[in-house]
Amino acid sequence: MKQEQVQIFTRRISQCNKSGLVVIVFDIIFAYMKEAKECLSADDYEGFKEALKKAQAGVDELIRSLDFGYEVSKDLYPLYIFVKEAMAKTVVTKRLDELDTAEEVLVNLHEAFSEAAKQDHSTPLMQNAQQVYAGMTYGRTQLNESFQAPEHSRGFLA
């Protein structure tokens, strides 16, 4: 993943609530799946394996975040396991059909979680993070972001 993507995900994480964080994890998984496909088409098998390993780590994070006190978690768990197994098969076979099927499952779940996140108006997880203002200034070819009121103690409050 490129450094610019990492910065974008980092900024999004610092501004999101619990529901938004799940959506961001899906987006990170999609970024690594795209990277894996690009590596495979470029015959970079090591990069392919590494990207899929990181995508699987994202799915692992989704699995760890399940709360089995809710019925929906019992339905999500087998889907996440299916996706992990499809990724593992893709590494072995070097064929993208399993990965494409896994991606379809994840896209449907991403859409559902995105809709749920739109209805979640809870406060951001990181209460003491810098505020990011986009659209205040523009570069020649891109939108610049402005950070306001830098503080020394940012992030989670203990």
Question: Where do the protein language model's features map onto the residues?
Answer:
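Short, charged, amphipathic alpha-helical segments
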Residues: 49-53, 74-78, 99-104
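Short, well-ordered alpha-helical segments
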Residues: 29, 69-81
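Short, charge-rich amphipathic alpha-helical segments embedded
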Residues: 56-74, 110-121
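Amphipathic, charged alpha-helical scaffolds that flank and support histidine-based chemistry
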Residues: 87-103
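N-terminal leader/targeting segments and the first structural element of proteins
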Residues: 1-67
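Short terminal interaction segments
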Residues: 1-11, 103-158
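Residues at alpha-helix boundaries and the short loops/turns that link adjacent helices
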Residues: 42, 69, 93-96
